[in-house]
C-alpha cells in the first residue's frame, strides 16, 4: 500500500495528481501530510507552492533517499519520517494546522521490480513481500500456515475462486520442498481450473500475500482513524485506492461519519450519530482516458475524499467491528 504504480521509474507519475492538487489547494499554503511518500510525487508538487510544508511518511526505508533529495531543495519545509502511516497520531503535531492528509495505496514499479522485496510473481528473488517495519515474510506464511489459514487469506484478501485448491497444493508440495517464488507460481498455475488471459494466474494470490504480510487492512483502518484525529476543521482526507477491498473500507469509513443513517425523528439530538465529515462526492474520482493511456496501471485507481466539519479529536466509529473478520485473518500471523 505504498506509492503509485508507475510505468517508468525514471518518470515518476503519481496517479490523479491534478485532481488531488485541486482538492487540497496548496496554492493557499498550509501543512500537509503525505502518508505514502514513495518517490515523492505528491510531496514535490505540493512543495512547489511557496507557503507549504509537508510531513511525509513511508514504511519503506529506501524512500528516505528520495526524501533527502527533496530536503536539499526545500530545506525545512519537508519533514520525512520512516514510519507506518497507522502511527501518524504519534507525530508531534500540536502546533501544526494540518490542512490535508493524503494516502496513495498503490505500489511503485521500482518496488514491484525489486527482487529483494519479492513482491512480484515475475521476480526470481526470495518470497519476501515485506515493505518495511514487518514482523514476518511471505516465505514464512506460505511455509508455516496450515491449509485452512492459507485458504482464508487467499479468499478474503485476494478474492481467489480457487483458494482451497491452491492452499491444499501448497501444503502438499511444501512437505517435499521449500516453497519459493517460482514454485509458488507453478503451484498456482497448475491449480487454476479456468485461465484468465487478461491477468496472470498468480495476481490474486500475490495480492493476498502482500496484504497479509504488510497487515494492510488494519494499517489502513488505523491510518484513517488517526487522519481524522489530526486533520483540522475544513481539512481534507484524500485516499487513492487500487482494489475493491481498500475502496470498500475507505467508502465505509467516510460514509459512516458523514451522515446520520436511520435516525428516528423521535430520537433526542444528543443521541444522534456524529456527523464528522462533509462528503463532497457520491462516486469516486477515476483517472481520465488520457491518464490511463499514459499510465495504464492507473486504470484501477479510485479517489475518495471528505472534508472535516468540526474540530473533534475524539469520536466513535464502528469500523473495527465492521471489518473484524479481516483483522482476525491478519492476526493469524501471531503463529509465525
UniProtKB/Swiss-Prot annotation:
UniProt keyword terms in alphabetical order: Cytoplasm, Methyltransferase, rRNA processing, S-adenosyl-L-methionine, Transferase
Reactions it catalyzes: cytidine(1402) in 16S rRNA + S-adenosyl-L-methionine = N(4)-methylcytidine(1402) in 16S rRNA + S-adenosyl-L-homocysteine + H(+)
Main location per the UniProt record: cytoplasm
Entry GO MF terms: rRNA (cytosine-N4-)-methyltransferase activity
InterPro entries referenced in this protein's UniProt entry, alphabetically: RsmH, SAM-dep_MeTrfase_MraW_recog, SAM-dependent_MTases_sf
Entry annotated with the keyword Iron: no
Gene3D superfamilies: Putative methyltransferase TM0872, insert domain (1.10.150.170), Vaccinia Virus protein VP39 (3.40.50.150)
Protein purpose: Specifically methylates the N4 position of cytidine in position 1402 (C1402) of 16S rRNA.
Protein name, per record: Ribosomal RNA small subunit methyltransferase H
The organism of origin for this protein: Pelagibacter ubique (strain HTCC1062)
Amino acid at each position: 500500500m505504498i506509492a503509485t504504480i508507475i510505468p517508468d521509474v525514471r518518470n515518476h507519475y503519481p496517479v490523479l495528481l491534478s485532481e488531488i492538487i485541486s482538492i487540497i489547494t496548496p496554492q493557499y499554503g498550509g501543512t500537509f501530510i503525505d502518508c505514502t511518500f514513495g518517490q515523492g510525487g505528491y510531496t514535490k508538487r505540493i512543495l512547489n507552492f511557496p507557503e507549504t510544508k509537508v510531513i511525509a511518511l513511508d514504511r519503506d526505508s529506501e524512500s528516505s533517499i528520495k526524501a533527502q533529495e527533496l530536503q536539499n531543495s526545500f530545506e525545512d519545509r519537508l519533514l520525512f519520517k520512516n514510519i507506518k502511516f497507522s502511527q501518524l497520531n504519534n507525530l508531534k503535531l500540536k502546533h501544526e494546522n494540518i490542512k490535508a492528509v493524503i494516502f496513495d495505496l498503490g505500489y511503485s514499479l521500482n518496488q514491484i521490480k525489486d527482487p529483494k522485496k519479492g513482491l512480484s510473481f515475475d521476480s526470481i528473488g526470495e518470497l519476501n513481500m515485506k515493505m518495511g517495519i514487518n514482523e514476518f515474510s511471505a516465505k514464512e506464511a506460505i511455509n508455516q500456515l496450515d491449509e485452512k489459514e492459507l485458504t482464508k487469506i487467499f479468499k478474503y484478501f485476494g478474492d481467489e475462486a480457487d483458494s482451497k485448491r491452491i492452499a491444499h497444493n501448497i501444503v502438499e508440495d511444501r512437505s517435499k520442498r521449500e516453497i519459493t517464488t517460482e514454485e509458488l507460481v507453478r503451484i498456482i498455475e497448475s491449480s487454476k481450473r479456468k485461465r484468465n488471459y487478461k491477468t496472470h494466474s498468480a495476481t490474486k494470490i500475490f495480492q493476498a500475500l502482500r496484504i497479509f504480510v504488510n497487515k494492510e487492512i488494519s494499517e489502513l483502518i488505523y491510518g484513517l482513524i488517526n487522519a481524522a484525529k489530526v486533520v483540522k476543521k475544513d481539512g481534507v482526507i484524500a485516499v487513492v485506492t487500487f482494489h475493491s477491498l481498500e475502496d470498500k473500507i475507505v467508502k465505509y469509513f467516510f460514509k459512516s461519519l458523514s451522515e446520520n443513517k436511520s435516525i428516528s425523528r423521535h430520537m433526542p439530538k444528543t443521541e444522534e450519530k456524529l456527523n464528522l465529515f462533509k462528503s463532497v462526492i457520491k462516486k469516486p474520482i477515476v483517472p481520465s482516458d488520457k491518464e490511463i493511456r499514459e499510465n495504464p496501471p492507473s486504470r484501477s485507481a479510485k479517489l475518495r475524499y471528505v472534508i472535516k466539519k468540526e474540530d473533534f479529536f475524539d469520536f466513535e466509529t464502528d469500523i473495527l467491528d465492521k471489518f473484524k473478520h479481516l483483522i482476525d485473518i491478519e492476526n493469524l500471523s501471531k503463529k509465525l
